[in-house]
Amino acid sequence: MDGQSDTDIGQAIIDKASRVLPGGTFGNFAAEVVIREGKAGRVWDETGKEYIDYLLGSGPMLVGHAHPEVTEAAQAQIARGTTFFANNRLGIELAEAIVEAVPCAEQVRFVSSGTEADLYAMRAARAFTRRDKILKFEGGYHGMSDYSLMSLAPRRSGNFPMAVPDSAGIPKSVRDDMIIAPFNDTEVVASLVREHKDELAGSSSSRSSASSRRPPAFSKSCAGSPPRMACR
């Protein structure tokens, strides 16, 4: 790329991504920037431009990028091996620490993504209750599974509880097992819960919707709904 400006180099990488990645991105949310490195709460793109990182990997970078202690621990473990498909002492100790720190976590199942966590949670709720339907709030994002990719964008059609798939390829049978409720509308939520109380296995909820935080009064009013199997 000799002779190219920083802007040209960045655009060339974006163009390459569009040829080899669906949508030109690793996920479903594209940004016209290619990150080169990160340190603490800041990242730099391929042109050297600096940004304050409010995303932090969508959650996992709790102590920021390239934290010295995290880097040192990761390098030490890489030298000993990374994936064993078996129990290991450090993983068990981490699970023990989580159980001690989280009052409602009696046991821990480690997964690689929020999508997997939601899938396991829905499966556990269905197994425990022997019911199939899950209540989800319109506009809430809970990963990329068929069950979660429903009614991500609030449409305010008033046609609750019908689920609207947000991707092609989602079977109708999956849609029929999801009940969609409006965010921050206690009256409608209560009505849906009463109507489907004998079918509901649980509800999937977040601390906030896609565009706003959950009002405390709404959270309190939902406390009597079916067991919340995912609260992220």
Provide a role label for each language-model segment.
Residues 50-132:
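Glycine-rich loop-to-alpha-helix module at the N-terminal edge of alpha/beta enzyme cores
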Residues 96-199:
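PLP-dependent aspartate aminotransferase-fold enzymes
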Residues 49, 202, 231-232:
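Hydrophobic "anchor" residues on beta-strands that sit immediately upstream
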Residues 52-55, 202-207:
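Short beta-strands and strand-loop turn motifs
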Residues 2-39:
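Active-site-adjacent loop/helix segments that line or gate small-molecule/cofactor pockets in enzymes
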Residues 185-192, 205-231:
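Active-site core of PLP-dependent enzymes with the aminotransferase class I/II
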Residues 33-53:
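Active-site and channel-lining beta-strand-loop segments
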Residues 74, 178, 203:
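Residue-level signal for inorganic ion chemistry
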